[in-house]
Amino acid sequence: MDYKRLLEIEKLYFSHEDVADLLAIKRGSAAVLCARYVKKGLLTRLKRDLYVRTETFAHLGITDLYRIANLLQVPSYISLMTALSHYGVTSQVQRGFVESVSIKRTKAFDRGGIAFRYLKVSTALYGGFVKDQGLFIASPEKAMIDSIYLASMGRYPLDVASIDLSKLDRKKLVRLAANHPPKTRKFLERMYEETGRSREL
């Protein structure tokens, strides 16, 4: 009966306090209840004291998955091939995972069959993102530079052949690459050379 009451919570994700307020019970009792429903598969635990109904999670759109990605590791922003796919810059199909950049350690979380991956960059290279529909996501050019940087360091498998450089602003790419290691700038140059667009740099 209590689980049916949880359907009244309109938030995408909720805490022990939300459950306690709804059911008029103590927070400790709400925590026990949530843990029980996680074991039964009715709730999915996103992180400490944060849950989503499993049935709801299974039908989430990509924007809500991005919001959850922002939440699982703070601070972070959507980037790499996930952002490039979002902007239509790559032909690579994104299924079953969401990629982000963070200043914390490189890590992956599996939630409800979705892999939320975070790759670490230094504080100096963290940025170039915008807030769109309540979520943080890299600009197209920053997502590209993040991908190139990590690939040039041997930390990311970038599918260069899937990238449509014509959809990116070359001046922004060059400007963003300026504070990255020489390897990154060289990688960018090679990408343009291999696609016959080297004069654009």
Feature roles, as predicted:
Residues 19, 83, 144:
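A residue-level signal for conserved active-site and pocket-lining positions in enzyme catalytic cores
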Residues 45-55, 65-125:
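Short gly/ser-rich loop at a beta-strand->alpha-helix junction or flexible surface loop bordering the NTP-binding
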Residues 24, 38, 88, 149-153:
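Hydrophobic/aromatic-lined pockets within catalytic cores
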Residues 22, 39, 85-86, 179:
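Residues at alpha-helix termini
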Residues 1-73, 112:
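Short beta-edge/loop segments at beta->alpha junctions of small alpha/beta modules
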Residues 125-201:
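Hydrophobic alpha-helical interaction segments
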Residues 10, 120-122, 148:
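Residues at the C-termini of beta-strands that transition into short coil/loop
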Residues 37, 83-84, 160, 177:
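Hydrophobic alpha-helix position signal
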